From Swiss-Prot:
Catalytic activity: 4-imidazolone-5-propanoate = trans-urocanate + H2O
Enzyme active site: C410
Statement: the UniProt record of this protein carries the keyword Signal: no
The EC number(s) this enzyme carries: 4.2.1.49
PROSITE patterns hit by this protein: UROCANASE (PS01233)
GO cellular component terms, A-Z: cytoplasm
Protein name: Urocanate hydratase
N-terminal signal peptide: none
Amino acid sequence: MDKRHDPSRRIIAPHGSQLSCKSWLTEAPMRMLMNNLHPDVAERPEDLVVYGGIGRAARDWDCYDKIIEVLKRLEDDETLMVQSGKPVGVFRTHADAPRVLIANSNLVPHWANWEHFNELDKQGLAMYGQMTAGSWIYIGTQGIVQGTYETFVAVAKQHFGGVAAGKWILTGGLGGMGGAQTLAGTMAGFSVLACEVDETRIDFRLRTRYVDKKATSLDEALAMINDANASGKPVSVGLLANAADIFAELVKRGITPDVVTDQTSAHDPLNGYLPQGWTMAQAADMRKTDEAAVVKAAKASMAVQVQAMLDLQAAGAATLDYGNNIRQMAFETGVKNAFDFPGFVPAYIRPLFCEGIGPFRWVALSGDPEDIYKTDAKVKELIPDNPHLHNWLDMARERIAFQGLPARICWVGLKDRARLAQAFNEMVKNGELSAPIVIGRDHLDSGSVASPNRETESMMDGSDAVSDWPLLNALLNTASGATWVSLHHGGGVGMGFSQHSGVVIVCDGTEAAAKRVGRVLWNDPATGVMRHADAGYEIAKNCAKEQGLDLPMLKD
């Protein structure tokens, strides 16, 4: 019997202002853990899988139940320790210490590979936390929509003079992360053709308004794209097909998309990528009997897909890796020029990271969408001179369906995060909001991750693989008074390829919270500016000087 599987479970976080725990500092992590497993949020909630292949919220259902039990009794001077999804200890700390400290999927570097991790996972000794799955701050596909939107806007500026109309994107994957591509692409003005092997995922994205149409053949999908481009109104199409098959077929037909990328779960060849010619059922059976054969076949198909991406790039498509490590998998399978197309961070996002700008997100613990709409208005009020941000907030309200507890994401940086958070805290204090707000972020942020094939690819000083930075980030956020802090390994790109940290803080309207959010939400993005200034980026150096950061080795 698999203790991780229970189809009878249907988890819905409490709404409203009534507490189940002893304070909002423990109620918040409880609600957010539960929200990660909401049926409209998680990919496979019955298996505790939130997104990203096997990214889980808790190690098994016994651990989940115990975490909830402990959070309900936890005092405001105690800290719960969670080791790979398992609650292992409660310790007396102090009121400004985190209520929960989480470490997920971390392995000593020599053993940091999927083979060793999968053995531990089978024995119930480890859990893959992805990024926000095991750190309890996943907000559904919205969590990556704006970052994807910002990337596609940058693609349009760099390659098409800022005009995406009449252009289309080819991609793969409509899971929890990949599902953002279709909506983000149409928001940026592109049409999008996304290949997905799991029809339930296409249907899920249709239901949550992330995909406009479904197709079952390439010809049908291309007709939809062509009609949309002719009409000038972008469309997103979920095509039920294997990405490797479709990418290669387009090369064969001589059809070149304007933009090519991919967001299948290629980071996990065992659980995340369906080999060409295989059915979902066949893959599920083979995972039980011959894991090595599954991995070999998956990586062979990834090689086909990446070769097609290279061929499409040579034919004129703007081609980018969207952070799932598919280039690495293809490289290991013989595609020696797999890295000839860039990752999205060095190509389009790094200047934002240099100013500590990244995926700032918040959630209304009340469950009331009005609380989010009021905070949207507050963001516009406090940042009046950023029409791009205002446009994003307007589009988000109009086009993004909330999944689980209402939430919002917008990319802001060092200059704005702390003051926005303090304004939200004041709104809770004066009753404008009906319950506290939690503020967090993706681990994909400027100072919280070391990932040489994604966020820290091609650092100008060669420090791509130095992982001191996310460790320092987690330590500083703990010292600063975050409500919960997490330190993970392997998110986004898989075992052995990343280390990263997460932070969440509660705005409960108290003076103590105002002080904590002021520290945490200044220090957290400041570590990103510090990291990039240390690597030599002038934008980061200038930002550090403008904001008065004390960086001892930064020369005047």
